[in-house]
Amino acid sequence: MRKIGIFGGTFDPPHNGHLLMANEVLYKLDLDEIWFMPNQIPPHKQKNSFSLSMHRVEMLKLAISGKEQFKLETIELEREGPSYTFDTVRLLKDRYPDHEFYFIIGADMVEYLPKWSNIDKLVNMIQFVGVKRPGFQIETPYPLVFVDVPIFEVSSSLLRDRIKNRQPTDYLIPDEVKVYVKENRLYET
């Protein structure tokens, strides 16, 4: 049975905080791989608020290249409509019956779990992994495994603003992603 961490998000753009979080979960939970899974239309975000899927996929490929245990999973981009975790997990379990899935969420998403579609069924299908900051307490009635990750204060929205305002992004995003963003003139307006 392969142990696979699923890391969903818009990754618009992917940054070093994403990579740090994935790497910490990979090693602390002794997983075989982390699959980065870009969302089609996350239910909690506006439809036109992020870059084209092809750009996000290409940036993710660049960000995770060279890390053998990091993979790209595009199952949510293959479907139409909103990306609900329950539907995605059902598809993944059908496609990969010999895999055990660990769904990685940030501390900020833990409080929203009661609002997730089919959450009571979902917690029986996968293991949720809550990524938290050292010393940050999270209360939830759901069975979560918590992983402490070093503090790295960066977000994709911060990076989009910095790029738009021509501020430096050094050490915040992988160099290959930075080049891709510049060559494709992403986030300039």
From Swiss-Prot:
Reactions the enzyme catalyzes: nicotinate beta-D-ribonucleotide + ATP + H(+) = deamido-NAD(+) + diphosphate
Role according to the record: Catalyzes the reversible adenylation of nicotinate mononucleotide (NaMN) to nicotinic acid adenine dinucleotide (NaAD).
Keywords: ATP-binding, NAD, Nucleotide-binding, Nucleotidyltransferase, Pyridine nucleotide biosynthesis, Transferase
Encoding gene, per UniProt annotation: nadD
HAMAP family (alphabetical): NaMN_adenylyltr
Similarity comment text for this entry: Belongs to the NadD family.
Molecular functions per Gene Ontology: ATP binding; nicotinate-nucleotide adenylyltransferase activity
Pathway listed: Cofactor biosynthesis; NAD(+) biosynthesis; deamido-NAD(+) from nicotinate D-ribonucleotide: step 1/1
Any GO BP annotation: NAD biosynthetic process
Protein name: Probable nicotinate-nucleotide adenylyltransferase
Taxonomic lineage: Bacteria, Bacillati, Bacillota, Bacilli, Bacillales
EC assignment: 2.7.7.18
